[in-house]
Amino acid sequence: MKLLKELLHSPLYLLQGLRYHFDGVFVTPKPRMIQFPVCDRCNARCIMCNRWQKDTATEIGIEKIREVFSSGLFSNIEDVNLHGGEPTLRRDLAEICRIIQNACPNLKRMWISTNGLGTERIEKRILEIIDVLNFGKLKALAINVSLHGLEETHDRIRGIQGGFKQSTETVRRLKKLSESYPIKLSIGTVIQPLNLYELDAMEDLARRLVVPIFFQPLMFDKFFNISGDTQLSFSEQEMETFKKVIEEKLANGISTTHFYWRDLLSMMNGSKRKSPCAFDRYVFSLYPTGEVLPCSREDWTVFGNVHDEPADKIWFGGKAKAVRQRMKKEVCPGCSFYCGVEFALQKEFFTYLRFYLKRRISDHP
């Protein structure tokens, strides 16, 4: 009876699920999520990322950003994720946030990811952002600080001596801010061989800091983090340990996050992806170079560049349509990327509903 009541409260999700399967098949919908790495500049030297090595001379300027977001293309945007590089290195980050919120009347959540290096600067930027946002419309300003292990491990992964102390101090400072301002703070940890055996300790650290922690798997692509570093390669034993961690910890539940981890485990064992993805129809990814993509997996997925043509023409153009079709055939079935999965599961609905019912029935036979 309880399960039935829960499902009866889901007509909106049902309608969204039908719309998801209509969008991208019969029509090209307006984007509903923005992924915007606002700069390649970074003050970290992470072993699993090469963005800090990129040329920053072509970083998109504030007037071009203003021009891009003057389009009506963004009227359906619900989520915005601003990252980098290190986004707080941009002095105009607050103005970027203001421009985007003004362009997105249906915006519900804004996410900002930071490496936590430079506590004073980060706190200043967040206060500047809080000052310009309209929280009457915005449900959440979410800030994620990345911590990739305990002190020695984190500093080794980050490539910055003393990085752990800086980042944990940033967490403490932002936690204090969250007591007075409407921000939601979290810690993000990328699972990799160097920190595989510290995940329990990281959860303990998060509890002491009174901040939720989220794990994600190590990923590689041609835009963010191509690396031949042997420290990033899981041994056979480490891979088995990783699978055990997923089975016993990360996939043990009924949330959309648990669904993803269970699906990833299946993919690690040879199955094709079951998780829906928002990137093939709903995500507008704008890069510091001005390039627009649906996804960062392959170099051929570039739709166009806002320095050459308007955002709406790029989004609805023939090249974008061809790229999306090719992606669905060549990339999506074997893609294990996490980004956009929870958003897509909420919109697609039916995949998660099957998972939810199966788990609830098995838990309550």
Q: Each predicted region: which residue ranges?
A:
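Radical SAM enzyme [4Fe-4S]-AdoMet core and its adjacent flexible, acidic
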Residues: 2, 6, 13, 135-306, ...
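Conserved alpha-helical substructure of the radical SAM core
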Residues: 3-141, 221-222, 348, 365
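Flexible mid-to-C-terminal extensions adjoining Fe-S/redox cofactors in radical SAM and related proteins
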Residues: 17-18, 30, 52, 274, ...
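Soluble, non-transmembrane catalytic domains of enzymes that act on hydrophobic metabolites at membranes
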Residues: 33-59, 64, 79-83, 186-192, ...
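Short, solvent-exposed loop/turn segments at secondary-structure junctions
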Residues: 41-43, 53-54, 87, 117-118, ...
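Activation segment
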Residues: 46, 91, 121, 154, ...
